[in-house]
Amino acid sequence: MEAIILVGGLGKRLRSVVSELPKPMAPIDNKPFLHYIFWYLNKQGIDQVILSTGYKHEMIETYFGNRYHGISINYSIEQEPLGTGGAIKKAFRKTTEENVVIINGDTLFLVDLRKMFERHISFKADLTLALKPMKEFERYGTVITRDSRVIAFKEKGYHSEGNINGGVYIANKAIFECESLSEKFSFEQDFLEKEFLQKKFYGFISDAYFIDIGIPDDYRKAQKELQHYI
């Protein structure tokens, strides 16, 4: 299997604790957060990764090189910010498989990718989203499904419970080859939340371990927790 990891963001909210590093290079137990994503992908049978880089991409390339944890690495470099959607579209030009895993570089969600891939294929989905059940939260929006089909997205705000977008996807390459797609766009706002009615988007619910290091509090939480899951 093949995966795209989005590691090109500026990580502004984490600057107060990791000022000189790209967010996926934030250290946890003397290793960058991205190391743990590679560990996870290796366990899930991923053998090829495209790192979608931007901010301080040389630092990432120097550390990970062309092979890491038994996974071959190729690079898709943003010379200017393209948004998450533009970054994915550009990275897809370097992929070789029809269906590809996409992962946010600041999130670790230990979902069973093999089962998720089977579900994606069985539904003949355009896109499958890994969804994490949560209770009492306001940092995330929620994804509503009916018979696994995505039927709505609800905005961020207080939710007593719901399924959040866990930042792990399996996408059919064809949906990013559409000529109408801009070279710069947000994957979440401009694509997911606008295309789910026209395209076949499905949810894959998993209560596996999830951590998002996008803010200082959760980065500190990851430093305490990750050792128990790796």
UniProtKB/Swiss-Prot annotation:
Q: Name one GO biological process term.
A: biosynthetic process
Pathway membership, UniProt: Nucleotide-sugar biosynthesis; GDP-D-glycero-alpha-D-manno-heptose biosynthesis; GDP-D-glycero-alpha-D-manno-heptose from D-glycero-alpha-D-manno-heptose 7-phosphate: step 3/3; Cell surface structure biogenesis; S-layer biogenesis
Could you tell me the keywords of this UniProt record?
A: Carbohydrate metabolism, GTP-binding, Nucleotide-binding, Nucleotidyltransferase, Transferase
SUPFAM superfamilies linked: Nucleotide-diphospho-sugar transferases
Reactions catalysed: D-glycero-alpha-D-manno-heptose 1-phosphate + GTP + H(+) = GDP-D-glycero-alpha-D-manno-heptose + diphosphate
EC annotation? Answer: 2.7.7.71
MF (Gene Ontology): GTP binding; nucleotidyltransferase activity
- Alphabetized InterPro entries for the sequence: Mannose-1P_guanyltransferase, NTP_transferase_dom, Nucleotide-diphossugar_trans
User: Which regions span the lipid bilayer?
Assistant: none
Report the CDD domains cross-referenced here.
NTP_transferase_WcbM_like
Q: Which class of enzymes does this protein belong to?
A: transferase
- Please name the PANTHER family in this protein's record: SUGAR-1-PHOSPHATE GUANYL TRANSFERASE
Q: Which family does it belong to?
A: Belongs to the D-alpha-D-heptose-1-P guanylyltransferase family.
Q: What does this protein do?
A: Catalyzes the GDP transfer from GTP to D-glycero-alpha-D-manno-heptose 1-phosphate, yielding GDP-D-alpha-D-heptose. Cannot use ATP, CTP, dTTP or UTP as substrate.
What is this protein identified as?
A: D-glycero-alpha-D-manno-heptose 1-phosphate guanylyltransferase
- Write down the species: Aneurinibacillus thermoaerophilus
List the taxonomic lineage.
Bacteria, Bacillati, Bacillota, Bacilli, Bacillales
Q: Which gene encodes it?
A: hddC
